[in-house]
Amino acid sequence: MRRLVVAMMVAGAVQAARAADMPDYYALRGPVGYSSGVVNWQGFYVGGQAGYGSADMNFSGSNNALIASALGPNNILIDVVQSVSGAHGKVGVHQTTYGGFAGYNSQWDDVVVGIEANYMHGKFNGTSIVAPVPLTYVTPFSDGLYHTIGLISGRSVSISDMGTIRARAGYAVGSFLPYVFGGLALGRADITSSVLIMDKSGNSISASQAASPQYYPASDSIGGKMLYGYTAGIGTEAMLFGNVFARAEWEYVRFVNAGADVNINTVRGGLGYKF
C-alpha cells in the first residue's frame, strides 16, 4: 500500500512539471478582461470620413445691432425698424462634407469610453434679404411727425470648417460598437451684413410720403470668425478585418455666435484604423 501511494505522488509531480513547461497559447486563452467574441477596441485610432449635411440658419433679428448703429443711440425709429428686420427668416442649406478623425478608447469588458477630435469641411452658405415696400405710419411718432420708413437689410453667413472635441461611450457587441457622444463644437465663418434705412417725415401722412428721404446706411464684414457651440450624436462602428473598421454616424451641431441661429445636422460614413 505504501508503495502504491508513493507511486501516485511521483506520477502527480511529474504531470505537474510537464504542465508547467507547456507554452501559454494566448490566442486560445483569449485576452483577459474582455468577453468571449468581443473585439478589443482599446487604443489610439485615426480615420477619414465623408457625408452629407443640412444647415438651418435663422436670421430673424440678426441685423438689430447694425440697425441701432446706423440710426444712432436713442433714435425714435430704432424699435420700428428692428421690428421690420424681424422678417428675416430661416434659410436651409445642403452640402456634402469630408474630413477626418482621431481618438483614443479605453475598454472595460464590453464598455468602451473615449475622447475624439473630429474635423469636417463643407461650404454652408446662407443669405437672407429683407426689402419690404416702404411703410407709412398713420399715427405720429414721439416727435409729433408722421413717418414713411423703408428698409433694405441683408445678412450672409458662410461656414466652411467645423471641428468637434467629444467624449463618447459605447457598448461592444461582437464586432460592433454602437455609441453616443457629446462635446464642444468649433467652426470658422465669414459674416457680412448691411442695412439701408430710409426715413421721410412730415406734419401729415401725405406730407411724409412726399418729403425728401433721409438715408441711414451701415455695413459690417467679419472674415474667419471663430465659432463655438456644442455637439451631440450617435453612431456605430464595425471591425472589418485586422484593425480596420467602418463607421456610420449622425451628428448635430449648434453654433451660438454665428450671426444667426445655426443648426447643422450631418450623416456620414468613414473608415478607420486602430493601432
Task: Label every model-predicted segment.
Residues R2-F275:
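Gram-negative outer-membrane beta-barrel domains
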